Regions:
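Membrane-anchoring hydrophobic helices of lipid-metabolizing enzymes
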Residues: 1-78
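Non-catalytic C-terminal accessory region of glycerolipid acyltransferases
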Residues: 3-4, 138-242
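Short histidine/acidic/glycine/proline-rich micro-motifs that form metal-
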Residues: 36-37, 111, 162-163
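Short, basic/glycine-rich phosphate-binding loops at helix/coil junctions
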Residues: 49-50, 119-124, 210-212
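Hydrophobic alpha-helical segments typical of transmembrane helices
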Residues: 50, 89-92, 116, 174, ...
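Catalytic core of membrane glycerolipid acyltransferases/transacylases, capturing the structured
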Residues: 57, 72-133
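Generic preference for hydrophobic
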Residues: 64, 80, 105-106, 211-213
């Protein structure tokens, strides 16, 4: 179901998203020049402007804890792992990141169907993941590693789908392969309250969202046994702040 309905808020939200994709000429110029740092900063600028403008349109407010745990750009790339309650989780993660750096996403394949969303995926250095397709999963792992090796951050929602409520589902074991393959640290993040925005009642509603950034987990320094233990610990850490 499309959460955006006809009316002023839909139009304003669409315009704000178009403002991000309108930067495509600048993105292409930076890519052609091989200016990775410039591209990362342009993504951050576009995402910050989008989330700061879209937030009042959607009626969202935020309460952020642990912001000091978000790595600075000079600390290198990382992956953000978060629970997934709602469509609005994108807003929550971008709000957390807006003063710290850009964020790409492991996105569902269905977004390709919508030109404006496909442009957002393309120009935010996000990647697609086709669920329940092992061959495509291997391809996505390679693409994610490439992005992270270049210095772009990535976010993944390890539950694989929205819980649409306060409760958190089980994490997919394969989700941790992204950070393990790229040898980057994980920032565990808990998001709570986004399901009030739409999923709870099936209509657009104001929502107060609590965002908790937990200490960074350096799985890139761990052996296989330690990484497996860390996976369970990360999942429990995220669940503990709900």
């Amino acid at each position: 179901m499309n959460i955006f309905k006809t009316g002023p808020r839909f139009i304003r939200g669409y315009i704000e998203t178009m403002r991000f994709t309108a930067l495509k000429k600048q993105f292409r110029k930076l890519r052609e020049a091989g200016d990775i740092e410039g591209e990362k900063e342009l993504i951050r600028f576009g995402q910050k402007r989008w989330v700061e403008n879209i937030t009042p349109i959607l009626g969202l407010t935020y309460e952020v804890h642990g912001e000091e745990n978000v790595p600075a750009p000079e600390d290198g790339p990382f992956m953000l792992y978060s629970n997934h309650q709602s469509f609005a989780d994108i807003c929550a993660t971008l709000w957390l990141m807006k003063d710290h750096g850009m964020m790409g996403y492991v996105s569902k394949e269905e977004w390709r169907k919508y030109p404006i969303l496909a442009d957002v995926v393309e120009y935010s250095r996000s990647i697609y993941l086709i669920r329940n397709n092992p061959k495509e999963a291997v391809k996505a792992l390679g693409e994610a590693k490439k992005m992270l090796d270049m210095g772009f951050n990535l976010c993944i929602f390890p539950e694989g789908t929205r819980s649409q409520c306060h409760e958190m589902g089980e994490f997919k074991a394969g989700a941790f392969k992204f950070a393990e393959k790229a040898k980057v640290p994980i920032l565990p993040v808990t998001i709570d309250g986004t399901y009030h925005f739409f999923e709870e009642k099936g209509t657009w509603n104001p929502a107060h969202i609590k965002i908790t950034a937990h200490p960074l987990v350096h799985i890139e320094t761990m052996d296989k046994h330690e990484q497996k233990e860390a996976q369970a610990a990360i999942e429990e850490t995220i669940r503990s702040a709900l």
